[in-house]
A protein has these predicted regions:
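Glycine-rich phosphate-binding loops of nucleotide-dependent enzymes
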Residues: 1-408
Length: 408
């Protein structure tokens, strides 16, 4: 909290006692929180770490305006509520807030007025009343109605039910977190995986892509059993993964956008291990244009891009491959509504081309709008297999929260 603004004794040494007392008083007086200032950052929750960041900007009492850029993106709902409450108290203290977020419910709850940007230009200045109208706000942000967010399918997986499944999982277990998981994905089918935190969604994805070892069960691609002990083996078997943590699992942040896009198809842009830079840049430019990745500069380090454009760069990496199964793990986490629309459209196009798609997401409306079927997990087991036609959001949420098992 005091980095760069340390309290010191008259002899120049760090006055830790005074800094600890000031930090403790700040948390207590500003937010009515009891946080021990002597605790190590690594031992704090994500929400507490975020509060420390906020406190560092405010501890000297000089700040009149605080800019928050996606402050709750990595947080669970309860943690996000804690941070939002702290921000509201700042407003009550007369501090100006500039709040940047793609979470529309937070914008509606926290902000008095807004500014909407699309493709780098201002398209509107919604007042507080309009901020409460999610449908109107999404239309302003995306340029079309919310009903058009999930593009219609050109084909249906039901037409190819006689074909061998793209993915066939039988009695998959890891001995700890998952037990006896069995399901298929047909060519051209989008299958969602839903479940509460800790239900096993992330473990299932890791087992399928060779990030964890299965203790029992089989995984088959196009009817052929595969041993998937590493991501390399999974990729060779015809799988592609868009991971849940793009910054740590999906991107090489210092590398350019072009380098990240071409990672899965280096053979197309190199000869005997030597890269043809012009060929690599041309391939990247093609995908940048097709997916509307902004800014459209293939040489720009990917760390400077927004979360939505980073996610589209990872998706572009796999679209040019011959992968048969696409695993999308939290594909729109931390992604703005415009990028979401592009990702949904590309996902539907993959299915229309006969690829299988597995979408693991904590966003129930997303699964309902995007998928043909939804697998629901509960405490490491598959408890429901729900066709989305005719399925309501309320019924899905009841099942996710431990409701009645159906059609397993």
């Amino acid at each position: 909290m005091f980095l760069g603004q340390e309290y010191r004794t008259r002899w120049g040494a760090l006055d830790r006692r005074r800094m600890n007392a000031a930090a403790e008083a700040f948390f207590r007086d500003s937010w009515q929180l009891d946080i021990n200032p002597r605790r190590l950052i690594r031992d704090l929750s994500l929400a507490e770490r975020k509060l420390v960041q906020i406190a560092r900007a405010l501890i000297d009492g000089a700040a009149k305006l605080v800019v928050f850029d996606e402050p709750t993106a990595p947080l669970e709902a309860q943690e996000a509520s804690l941070v939002s409450s702290a921000i509201l108290r700042l407003r009550e203290q007369g501090i100006g807030i500039l709040y940047i977020s793609h979470y529309l419910n937070e914008i509606a709850a926290l902000c008095d007025r807004g500014t909407v940007l699309r493709n780098g230009e201002v398209v509107g200045y919604p007042d507080r009343a309009l901020l409460q109208d999610t449908d109107a706000l999404i239309k302003m942000m995306v340029g079309r109605d919310i009903e058009q967010l999930y593009t219609p399918r050109q084909s249906s997986a039901q037409q190819v039910d006689a074909a061998a499944p793209v993915l066939s999982v039988r009695h998959l277990s890891d001995g700890v977190h998952l037990n006896d998981i069995t399901f298929d994905i047909q060519p051209g089918e989008i299958v969602g995986v839903a479940g509460l935190l800790g239900a096993g969604r992330d473990v299932l994805v890791d087992l399928l892509y060779g990030l964890r070892r299965a203790r029992s069960g089989t995984i088959s691609i196009d009817g052929q059993p595969k041993r998937l002990r590493t991501p390399y083996q999974a990729t060779r078997a015809g799988m592609a993964l868009v991971p849940r943590d793009r910054r740590h699992q999906g991107l090489i942040l210092p590398f350019s956008t072009a380098d990240n896009i071409n990672l899965a198809s280096l053979a197309e842009t190199a000869t005997f291990g030597w890269e043809h830079r012009g060929r690599a840049l041309a391939k990247a430019r093609s995908w940048i244009e097709q997916l509307s990745i902004r800014p459209g500069r293939p040489e720009l380090p990917v760390r400077f891009m927004s979360g939505g454009n980073q996610q589209k760069a990872i998706l572009a990496r796999w679209l040019g491959t011959d992968a048969r199964l696409f695993i999308l793990d939290e594909p729109t986490l931390g992604v703005d509504i415009g990028a979401r629309s592009d990702i949904y459209q590309r996902t539907r196009e993959l299915a229309d081309r006969g690829r299988g798609v597995l979408v693991s997401s904590s966003d129930a409306p997303e699964l309902l709008g995007l998928c043909d079927r939804i697998l629901v997990m509960w405490r490491g087991e598959l408890v429901a297999n729900l066709p989305t036609r005719g399925l309501t959001l309320d019924a899905l949420l009841v099942t996710i929260n431990g409701g009645q098992e159906q059609q397993v």
